[in-house]
Amino acid sequence: MAKIFLSAGEASGEHYGALLMAEISRLAPQTEFFGLGGTRMAAAGLRRVVRAEDVAVMGITEVILHMPHVYREYRKLKASLRTERPDLAILIDFPDVNLSLAAELRRLQIPVVYFVSPQLWAWKKWRVRGVKRNVSRMLVIFPFEEAFYRAHGVAADFVGHPLADLDPPTVTREAFASENGLDASKFWVGLLPGSRARELHANLPPMLETARLLGPEYEYLLPVAPTLKDPQVQALAVQAKGAGVRVVHDARAVLQHARASVVASGTATVEAALIGNPFLVVYRVSRITYAVAQRVVRVAHIGMVNLIAGRRIVPELVQHDFTASKVVERLRPLLENEQARATMQSDLRTVGAALRVNSEGAIQHAARIALQLIPAEQSPRLQSALVSSWPVE
């Protein structure tokens, strides 16, 4: 029986971690999992040494305030590795913790798979040296990342993006309208400011002003996860309702049925591209964070869709350029000009195709590669089963 250590400290990574555990369990029944994760991974069978919610802090101030506690939890993880000696470690995103764990795992001579690369290609390229030294295999979800890591001598494989494996939302426009009290005769505009309180505070006000400027001929939809209980988030939702914006609970359905959307930089931009919803990317952070980013970030675009395409196929409004008037200026063609819409949708289909490797799926692909790194002497029957079940291209 194989024993695998996993570490995922953020919501998206934890979601991928739970899916990965399910696929590994299918391929290698009775595999034992332990490590760092959230409630989804616990439900999938992870024996939690550290809870993700106890170490997930954001922003420079929060990191400084919580440093002693985070360090204590990190020491727990290191101690568990020395005691349990897993056959394999799978680290998922969360670079502030996982890159340090990778160094400890190398010292213990435990194979390390890193799934979902930290964005070292955008900044902190110097940290690639540590990845080369400490990570056995980097499994990336964006196509350009494979070439970046291989150029730096890192064994890397593009496995596809997990979101590309999802089926389109099944809810019809009529059903979604009925469920949420929407006017189905109007075009809908999606407003996706991000899911964290900090992102909503930065991005929602200009989005609400955008709705005011565009006027009542459109219906404006703000998806907010029903599980978000943060009082600040709830207050912002109330503010949105007061501005005539409808608060709903299904972001993917919004992207499926909106005429066009305004989307904060992040995972939602990839979802919009895969669904084929015309959109523009917005991004706003604190002045200090932006000043630092200007000095260290070395990429031509902030939108992942544009990075994948290698050119700007989706408009970007960053920091001071992110104003309601400029959003309206960029959004109107996507609402009113059929040629502009068709051109963007064609470009988005090309990006979507680039996020898929084969029919197997990203999670399945990642699980098979990861299990191959378990030394054969540890589980010879597992290795034999993997070889016989590997898909023929």
Protein language model features and the residues they cover:
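Nucleotide-activated sugar donor-binding and catalytic core shared by glycosyltransferases
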Residues: M1-E393
